[in-house]
Amino acid sequence: MKNKFTHFLMAGALVCWSSYTLHAQTEVTDTYLKNPSFESSFTDWDNAGLQTQTNTSFSKKDGNTYVEQWVGQGNKVADAHVSQTLTSLKNGVYKLTVAAQNIQQNSSATQSGAYVFADNEQVSVGAINDYSLTFTVIEGQA
């Protein structure tokens, strides 16, 4: 395995809308998500095995910082995660959008094993892109 990068940026959008026929979306990132672009390192995040980085190799970052796990050629990427428990959410349907990538340097091969998750939902991460998923809050937490 060559160098492998996994970059996550939680600064996309967290929106909420009503489940009624008339759908109204409201941007709620700043209301519920703390330190969404990791500008304060891992403050407010549960981190296991990831590091912050400030170089320019992740073009979708918002601000100066992003999160990555990088390993040298011939090494395997270890299990890692970064998460945040959101509380006091209003009941409803939410959409989480995250800028992320899961790549092996100098290879166009599709990589696996990286996910964006919220509550019981997840979406697989591959090439650099915005990844979205929806989840439902019933008891105020995700």
Where in this protein do the model-derived segments appear?
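Bacterial Sec-dependent N-terminal signal peptides
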Residues: 1-26
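Short coil-to-beta strand junction motifs in C2/discoidin
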Residues: 108-114
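Extra-cytoplasmic beta-strand recognition segments
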Residues: 38, 80-108, 133
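Extracellular glycan-recognition surfaces and repeat-rich motifs
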Residues: 27, 37-77
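Boundary/junction segments of secreted and surface-exposed precursor proteins
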Residues: 24-34
